[in-house]
Each structure stands twice: as structure tokens, then as C-alpha cells.
Amino acid sequence: MPSHLTSPSRPRPARRARVLTAVVACVLALAGCGVRLETPPPAEPSPDAIEQVRGRTVADALALAGGATAVASGAVDDPVRAVLDDVAAFSARHAEELGGVYDSGLPDPSPSASPSPTASVVTDVTALLAALVDDAARATTDADAVPDPELARLVASVAVARDALAERLAAVTGLPRPAPAAGVDGDDAPDDATATSEPVAPSATATQDGGTSPDAGEPAPATQGAAALALAHDEAAWAFTVLAARSSDATRTSMLEEAARHRAASDAWARTAGVTGRPADPRRAAYALPAGLDDPATAQALPRSLEQAVADASAGAVASAPAGARLDAIASLRTATAAAVAWGAAPVPFPGMPELATALVP
């Protein structure tokens, strides 16, 4: 009997259609439930320590600018308005030089974010004065701690500018200057009275006798900054002594007091740099004086120039010092800035940073 070969069974078209229909239905169901088979959207990067300081200083600057503008729009006296205008203009410059508000280009996850606490409380002169004091203290602490030396120099300059604005606003309004609010950093920063005390040693290469170890090699940047500041103070001390000799009795006493203050500060920074009594000491026996010192205008301008030079060197010492050892240099910048203004210098938005000394045009 002939055998019958059975051919292999093949899927029927109807069965294939049913399977395909089921797959499509499953995909559509998943899509309807919000399931997406794709990569997640890019996340906002977490700011590092440097960006946190930069962003915080920018936010405070913008809040101060907005607060000063709001207060100035009310009924205030002309002297108060002049200071408020400087608060707004200086703070706008601060935010600009710091790079402004960070924008990652990603969609804002919280478009209705509330304003910062500082911005919400600046409604009058008293609140603005408190905000200036708090923000100056916070910037001082940030400048001391931030790892980036150039950002430290810039933030220190901003802190000193805010401190000077607070002094001016308190003076024209007759309001007492408040202490920083509880919880605001900066309470440990040296004040003007301690700016000439012994600064913190910048490096471990200094020996107990004030020199540097023979195998220390090239001076560390912190040592160079401290030595440059010692030189600026020494030149100021010498010039004030010359001015005292050329002054009347009424002015001679104040000139000699300034000379003594700068000489003490010079000695302190020289010891910090480890150059006292060594060939590396940059201080000199005498310094060049500007031509035409017999002209009263030239003689009156010299103290301003001397203090501004100390301020510039102080800002340089901030940048050269390691993080956590900058408070004395910041205090020196604050003192020199206040002294320059006392001798007739115009307030500037960036003390100690002559490269940013563009005059503000009303």
C-alpha cells in the first residue's frame, strides 16, 4: 500500500493576523497609559561649590538692585536717593560681572518659583540696610571659602562694596547699622579695628624666626600676595611720613597716625610672608613721590592714591591666599577702601579691582 507523506503544517494567515492585532493593541494600550520606551529627559546639573557661591552672590545682587529701585521710587530725600541709586547701579554691575543668572537651556521645572527671601522683605530703607549688611557678611564668608581664587577676589570686592554702601546708607538716614541676622555667615570676619593685627600665616614654609625654609623653593602665591601687601603698606607709611613733614600742625598729627598704622600693617604682612630681615623682603628705604607735590591738589590726591594701592594689593592677597585663610586680606581691603573714601575717593562698585573701575554714568 503506497505511503502518504504528510507535509509540515504552516501557520494560517488568519492566525498571523490575530497575533499582529494583539501586539498592536498592546502597544496602543501602553501608549495610552503614559508608558514611553525612550530615554529620560536631561536633568538639571547639580551646582558645585564654585557655582553655588557665584549663583548666591548673583541672586543677592539682583535682590538688592530691585529693592533699592523700589525704595527709591517712593518719597525719599535726595541724599538718600543718591545712595539708593548707587546700591541699584553697583548691584547690577555685580550681577553682570559675576555672569548673571545661570541658564542651562533646559525647561524650567518650576516656572512659578517664589522670589528669594531677601527680595520679599526689602520694602523700605530699614529693610534694605539690613539686607546690605547680611549680604555683605555672606559674601565675605563665601569669598574666604570658595575654591576658585579669582572668584574669591571678585566676591570679596563685592562684599566690601556692599559693606561700604551699608555704611553710607546708615549715615544719610541716621539709622543704626544692624548686626548680621542670626544664621547669616560672616560673623567671624575681622572688622576694621583688627585689620592691622597679625594676619594668618599663608603657608607652612615659614620658620619661627620669620624667614622661610631654605628648601622652600619659589615663594608660594600666598607668600607673594602677602609680601606685595607689605610693600604697599610700607610705601604708604613712608609717603605719609613725608606728607606729615610738609604739613601744618593741624594735619601733621593725622598724617603721622596714618604712617604708624601702615607701618604696623606692613610689618605684620611681612612676617606673614616670611620675608622679614631676609633678601626677599621687597620693602625699600625710600619711594618715588609724584611730581608737583608742592601743588595742594597733588598733595591732597596722594593719600587717596596710597590707600587705593593698598586696596589693590589687598585684593591680590585675597586671590593668592588659600581657601579658609583670606579673612585678614578681606579686612585689609575693607579698611583701605574706607580710608580712600575718607580721603576723598569716589565710591566704586569693585574696590581693589582697577580693571573694573569704569565710571558709572547716571
For the regions a protein language model found, what residue spans apply to each?
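All-alpha RGS (Regulator of G-protein Signaling) helical domain and cognate RGS-like helical scaffolds
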Residues: P2-L5, A14, G34-P362
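Sec-dependent N-terminal signal peptides
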Residues: R15-C26
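C-terminal motif of bacterial Sec signal peptides marking the signal peptidase cleavage site
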Residues: L28-G32
